[in-house]
Amino acid sequence: MAVSDHHCGGGGRSWRFAVACGVLSRCVKAEAAAAANGRHRHHPTMLLMPGADVEPDVREEAAAAAQLKIMYGGRMLVFDDFFPAGGAVVELVRAAARAGQDVRRAGAARRRVGDSRGLDAGLPVVRKVSLQRFVEKRRRMRVYHILYTDKSSHHVPGPGRYRSWQCRIIIAAVAGAGGFVVACGVLSRCVKAEAAAAAANGRRHHHHHHTTMLLMPGADVEPDVREEAAAAAQLKIMYGGRMLVFDDFFPAGGAVVELVRAAARAGRDDDGARARRRPAGGEEGVAAAVRGEEKSQAARGDGAVHTRHSPPMLPARTPGSGRTDDAAFY
């Protein structure tokens, strides 16, 4: 019995050992297969700044108010407490660009008209010369007609007939070869007619009208030369430590005034938006705050403005003005 029990007990141990070896072999194979598949898995990297990619639940504070400066032609207009909410600065820059483009188109059109006139400048000269010849010939015929008519009549013409006798003398003198003799005859008859009229009216003293000599001859004559257009200057818009520069900005067409009005209008819109965003009591205040936040987010969706860093700020010439009338700028 003891031997049999010993053999039976030994057989049970050997069977258990074989089962344990089989289980161990399967576990080793499974771990090897898992290790081979694990090489192609993505291992997440540890963030150096945990929480950096998480959106904050706290609302960002509104941008602080800053000065808006518009400089053009050596003058500067300053708006204090100008808020950028609602895309006001973007709208201001767009107005400046639109005004500059309109003025450039008008200048190009004027230059094209001037070039077309310059091409035809030599054509009217021939017409002018022919017209002068025709008028001169007409004057000669008229002078001869008047002189011959007066000679045929045997009465002395009245003074009203020779009110422009100076012009007739000049025309007769230029009329031809015998113009000097004709001019002397016309002058003699004009003098006699004036003397007869003075004797008839009883005037002994002739009051002549003395013309005053101008101190600056030609000052009252309109110049024929066109005035040159206003020179182009730089338009600078500074806000929040940055500056936007428009080169070759012409002031024609009230572009600068329109720009200032746009800035003032944008400032008023921002003031109204801030007034609407003020906290109120009850459910109405919460609803108003929600509507104001939605409008501000929709306004921030406009395109960004390309700016460049500006040099140190210049001292404002008219601080705290904020006026929008034309006299404040000009």
Curated annotation (Swiss-Prot):
Main localisation: nucleus
Pfam family name, one: Jas_motif
Motif residue range(s): Nuclear localization signal: 126-133
One Gene Ontology term from the biological process aspect of the record: response to wounding
UniProt cross-references to InterPro entries, sorted A to Z: CCT_CS, TIFY/JAZ, Tify_dom
Post-translational modification as stated in the protein's UniProt record: Ubiquitinated. Targeted for degradation by the SCF(COI1) E3 ubiquitin ligase-proteasome pathway during jasmonate signaling.
Start and end residues of each Tify domain: 61-97, 228-264
GO cellular component, as recorded: nucleus
Keyword annotations of the record: Jasmonic acid signaling pathway, Nucleus, Repeat, Transcription, Transcription regulation, Ubl conjugation
Subcellular location, record wording: Nucleus
Start and end residues of each stretch annotated as Disordered: 267-330
PROSITE patterns: TIFY
Keyword check for Lipid biosynthesis: no
Motif (Jas): 124-142
Family: Belongs to the TIFY/JAZ family.
Known function: Repressor of jasmonate responses.
Name of the protein in its database record: Protein TIFY 11f
Record organism: Oryza sativa subsp. japonica
Upper classification of the organism: Eukaryota, Viridiplantae, Streptophyta, Embryophyta, Tracheophyta
